[in-house]
């Protein structure tokens, strides 16, 4: 939103292992849009059950650099054509932000100064790996009140107390189905989850974050509604859209004054 990054420009990274001719490395075609849509085309690591063996999970426990690991995957598909949920794709987006900011201290202060403090998310901690890089694919410690503030910012189209913190274009991006999900139900946008084609009885404009073990922030503009749910679930043990359906049942439908 500050004009430092563009969704459709190549990331411009140095990749590992280095190609004999880096300028012709096919990974150079990967854009910020691709990684935020979870469709980089890079090899599967986390989603293949290897998160804590060779994937992003190693960085959680003072292991290798999260960013170097994210840049060390081979390209196995054309970017933008196949959806695969990978923490490493998010970490590539974080690295792109670091390069765009260009100053380590500003990078570390950026989330709090430009977002968290402005909306009062004072109980939220964004962890880094041991090299000082944010692990924004995970390791974000927060509480329900802060998540509610985050959801309210999106419900208000990026405005907070009269100040625009997030552009409407960004909000449109995060709640637009990733092109690569067209064949699998359109259930994912830009780092946010969507009801998709198969969630009956759910407003089509709803969208939701999803944290480990059932941490959800659901935004429903058509009902002026934000729902925060905290949990400690086993994988697949809770339906955020089922929760939304039950909440909507409890809200009386508006009727015209007579």
Model-flagged regions — what are they?
Residues 121-128, 171-226:
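Active-site Gly/Thr loop motif
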Residues 7, 11, 15, 28-32, ...:
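Stable alpha-helical elements in mature extracytoplasmic
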Residues 50-73, 79:
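Amphipathic alpha-helical interface segments
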Residues 23-26, 77-86, 135-141, 209-216, ...:
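Solvent-exposed loop and edge beta-strand segments that line ligand/cofactor-binding
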Residues 206-258:
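Structured C-terminal helix/loop/strand segments within mature extracytoplasmic catalytic/sensor domains
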Residues 1-4, 35, 70, 84-115, ...:
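Alpha-helical scaffold elements that line and support the substrate/ligand-binding pocket
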Residues 2-42, 72-75, 102-138:
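Active-site helix/loop module of the DD-peptidase/beta-lactamase fold
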Residues 111-112, 116-176:
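Active-site-proximal binding-pocket segments
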């Amino acid at each position: 939103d500050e004009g430092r990054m563009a969704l459709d420009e190549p990331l411009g990274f140095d990749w590992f292992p280095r190609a004999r001719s880096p300028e012709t490395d096919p990974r150079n075609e990967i854009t910020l849009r691709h990684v935020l849509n979870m469709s980089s085309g890079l090899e599967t690591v986390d989603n293949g059950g290897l998160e804590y063996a060779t994937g992003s999970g190693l960085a959680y426990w003072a292991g290798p650099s999260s960013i170097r690991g994210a840049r060390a995957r081979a390209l196995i598909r054309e970017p933008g054509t196949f959806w695969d949920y990978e923490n490493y794709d998010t970490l590539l987006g974080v690295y792109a932000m670091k390069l765009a900011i260009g100053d380590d201290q500003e990078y570390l202060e950026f989330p709090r100064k430009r977002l968290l403090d402005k909306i009062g998310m004072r109980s939220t901690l964004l962890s880094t790996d041991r090299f000082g890089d944010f692990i924004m694919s995970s390791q974000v410690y927060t509480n329900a009140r802060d998540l509610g503030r985050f959801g309210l910012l999106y419900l208000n189209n990026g405005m907070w107390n009269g100040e625009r913190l997030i552009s409407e274009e960004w909000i449109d991006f995060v709640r637009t189905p990733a092109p690569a999900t067209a064949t699998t139900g359109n259930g994912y946008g830009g780092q946010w989850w969507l009801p998709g084609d198969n969630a009956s009885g759910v407003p089509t404009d709803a969208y939701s974050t999803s944290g480990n073990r059932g941490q959800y922030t659901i935004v429903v503009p058509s009902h002026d509604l934000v729902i925060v749910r905290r949990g400690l679930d086993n994988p697949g043990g809770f339906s955020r859209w089922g929760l939304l359906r039950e909440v909507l049942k409890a809200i009386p439908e508006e009727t015209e004054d007579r």
